[in-house]
A protein has these predicted regions:
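Phosphate/diphosphate-binding loops
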Residues: 22-86
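Short, basic/aromatic recognition patches
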Residues: 117-136
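Short beta-strand scaffold segments in enzyme catalytic cores
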Residues: 5, 140-147
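Generic long, charged, amphipathic alpha-helical segments
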Residues: 156, 162-191
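Long, charged amphipathic helices and adjacent flexible linkers at domain junctions
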Residues: 74-123
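Single conserved hydrophobic/aromatic residue that forms the stacking wall/gate
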Residues: 1-7, 11
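A structural-propensity feature for long, helix-poor, extended segments
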Residues: 18-22, 27-35, 178-191
Length: 191
């Protein structure tokens, strides 16, 4: 995932994600677990997108989006029970089959071992970031604030490089304070 957000409807989610990075979405894929409304479709229409995935598109959304050339709309059952519980990866000379990691445990205040205790909003951002970072590949770092990703760093030889990328993106979005950072592993030094 490049940019993600949490909000009560697709329009608000899309607005928050788009405001975080207006460049990376170009030619991208939008996936949501809520119905795409006409209002959300009108926001997405001017953006070059390859695919929009959602459990449903309302009639107004279809009217708006079906006029776009080369855009594929996919209605997908987003319930966890609809997902194949196995993951298949092709490897040289074979096939790796493993259980799909669909569970994400929530971070709770009693897990916090620092002297400074996070506010409720920071706990929400920690859980949001934790749910996103598990889908980012290799030395993953996600920077979050107010229920949206502001920076994503991945694919670097070390997490410090990924963190630098993610923080640079957050700063480019104009946010420099109150950030929450989620990582898929440990840093090579004490925080």
């Amino acid at each position: 995932p490049l940019y993600s957000s949490a909000a009560s409807d697709v329009y608000k989610r899309q607005t928050k994600a788009y405001e975080a990075d207006k460049v990376s979405i170009f030619g991208g894929i939008v996936a949501t677990n809520r119905t795409v409304t006409k209002e959300a479709a009108e926001l997405m229409k001017p953006i070059f997108l390859e695919i929009i995935m959602a459990p449903k598109f309302d009639e107004g959304a279809l009217e708006v989006l079906c006029t776009k050339k080369n855009l594929r709309l996919l209605e997908v059952d987003m319930e966890q029970g609809a997902v194949d519980p196995k993951q298949y990866v092709s490897v040289n000379g074979g096939l790796l089959v493993q259980d799909l990691d669909v569970e994400t445990k929530s971070v709770t205040a009693d897990m916090c071992v620092t002297a400074a205790k996070p506010a409720a909003e920071q706990m929400d951002d920690m859980n949001f970031g934790w749910h996103i970072v598990k889908h980012v590949k290799s030395n993953a770092i996600v920077v979050v604030k107010d229920g949206r990703t502001l920076g994503v760093g991945a694919g670097q030889m070390n997490r410090i490089g990924s963190a630098e990328i993610a923080l640079k993106q957050a700063h480019a979005a104009g946010v420099t304070e109150g950030l929450v950072l989620a990582s898929d592993g440990f840093f090579p030094f004490d925080d």
